[in-house]
Amino acid sequence: MGQIPLEHGLIVATILFALGFYGVMVRRNLLFMLMSLEIMMNAAALAFVLAGSVWAQPDGQVMFILILTLAAAEACIGLAIVLQFYHRFHHLDVDAASEMRG
């Protein structure tokens, strides 16, 4: 089976990143914004893995592991913030975040 051309993979990564960015900018629900950030991080990880595969370097896989670790930490902290936000306001509308004090 042949290798995926770099251009095709970067196009897919760009589309994924754009979808994630669109989700962060348009959606007002905190949970959907968190999921959109995860999509953006996965798009960057895909670009690193693809570049490492094309140039036969393990650096792309190392960066993928780093991004995977950062995404897991971001998900944990983000979900904790989402839970606290929901317990306080009983909704996940991010426009209400300006009312937060503490």
From Swiss-Prot:
Its EC number is 7.1.1.-. One of its GO terms (biological process) is ATP synthesis coupled electron transport. The chain crosses the membrane at residues 6-26, 30-50, 62-82. Pfam families: Oxidored_q2. Keywords: Cell inner membrane, Cell membrane, Membrane, NAD, Quinone, Translocase, Transmembrane, Transmembrane helix, Transport, Ubiquinone. It catalyses: a quinone + NADH + 5 H(+)(in) = a quinol + NAD(+) + 4 H(+)(out). It comes from the Bacteria. It is a multi-pass membrane protein. Signal peptide: none annotated. It is found in: Cell inner membrane. GO terms for molecular function: NADH:ubiquinone reductase (non-electrogenic) activity; quinone binding. One of its GO terms (cellular component) is plasma membrane. NDH-1 is composed of 14 different subunits. Subunits NuoA, H, J, K, L, M, N constitute the membrane sector of the complex. NDH-1 shuttles electrons from NADH, via FMN and iron-sulfur (Fe-S) centers, to quinones in the respiratory chain. The immediate electron acceptor for the enzyme in this species is believed to be ubiquinone. Couples the redox reaction to proton translocation (for every two electrons transferred, four hydrogen ions are translocated across the cytoplasmic membrane), and thus conserves the redox energy in a proton gradient. Belongs to the complex I subunit 4L family. This is NADH-quinone oxidoreductase subunit K. It comes from Acinetobacter baumannii (strain ATCC 17978 / DSM 105126 / CIP 53.77 / LMG 1025 / NCDC KC755 / 5377). The gene is nuoK.
